[in-house]
């Protein structure tokens, strides 16, 4: 069993917004065998889903990665995407917190010396424009990513909350979800669009499991 809580306002308290635990039970009796940290598992799983999408939907030659956010989920996405695409030569990082952005770059610049890291501060346009893959790994409740920030042919991996304006989804050639039925009643951008009648079920091209 996996138990996860998401509190977006935790960011203002200087603590992570996603926490979780996992309980492993014996399959024949149901007795609990272990209680383990579910937070790391959740981060790995989330980034892995993004990588599955990237494997099939990313441009042919991925060289530039733009990541909006610099927390644990952003770091996990960089780690797995760089493993999936060794061709990545540049990683742009945009963060509301300069210290967090600097820590992100410091963590990876020695581990991946073949990658040029670009600190973009609050400039999400600089981070996203002309990037082959864009990842938003923040818990924003107001858009920071605009339609004009997205270059034709790029892949946008939406991880967080309501960090992109409606125009981003309307500009997309295809919208692919991990599981549309499970997620369409949440508060992410395309879910808001669905509730407002702007997006319909038939506008979703596919689920990742299709």
Q: Language-model features: where?
A:
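N-terminal ligand-binding/catalytic initiation module
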Residues: 1-43, 51, 58-61, 206
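Short helix-loop-beta connector
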Residues: 57-64, 87-88, 151-152
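Glycine-rich Rossmann-fold phosphate-binding loop(s) that bind the pyrophosphate
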Residues: 69-71
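N-terminal Rossmann-fold NAD(P) dinucleotide-binding loop
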Residues: 74-75
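NAD(P)-binding Rossmann-fold cofactor-contacting core
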Residues: 83-111
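Rossmann-fold NAD(P) dinucleotide-binding segment
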Residues: 126, 133, 139-157, 167
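Short glycine-/small-residue-rich Rossmann-like dinucleotide-binding loops
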Residues: 138-140, 160-161, 180
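Adenosine-phosphate binding glycine-rich loop
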Residues: 169-210
